[in-house]
């Protein structure tokens, strides 16, 4: 049996989550710093980076560099140390906005507004994906890409302001849920355990240089998600007008539903529904 190295910035958070597992080892790591890893792993899963909408606008430089420089250093490490495979966790935001109501397939893309500072995240993910594909083509580094949609579950942090996490924590504390939009936006909400299974499926069965959606067959609106959580927590659901700061952080994609056919061909099957 091998070891699992968890590279992260915060040792206290690591201990709280993984401290009782003997095979899991902490490595101090910041995607913005120079890579300093003594061990040579067989597989690398790169999921580091800023993942909160309010940071995309307040820290766009760090948002871009933690993605691009972070994956660049790991790809270079993998090339030099003959790592078996690298999996880069990208995002469904690489797809951008489109007029069609159909779920996104991996080869279908919409528009990303390069003048909107919030696009720092989506553009960084697109650039990082291209770097992964380039390392695969030019240097033969075995790398695959995962594109998660909207993931929810018990691993969420209380300061996570994405709607599924924010709504869940409000309901858990008995507070009313406040929606800042009509909630008609379409999403592919995926439970964290299903997400983990899909990541491992891509890691073990995916094709080098290819990207795979991580989502769920069930397409859900934000309003439906809010209603389900409010009912489960027995709290009120209200709609209020968004502030300018709220609007600045909004995901511009009214439809970010994902087509899961490609990962299903690797043998993956959904387990959990939103309900």
Predicted regions and their residues:
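NAD(P)H-binding glycine-rich loop region in Rossmannoid oxidoreductase-like domains
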Residues: 28-66
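Active-site helix of classical SDR
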Residues: 120, 124-127
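NAD(P)-dependent short-chain dehydrogenase/reductase
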Residues: 98-107, 130-187, 192-201, 227-232
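N-terminal Rossmann/SDR dinucleotide-binding element
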Residues: 1-43
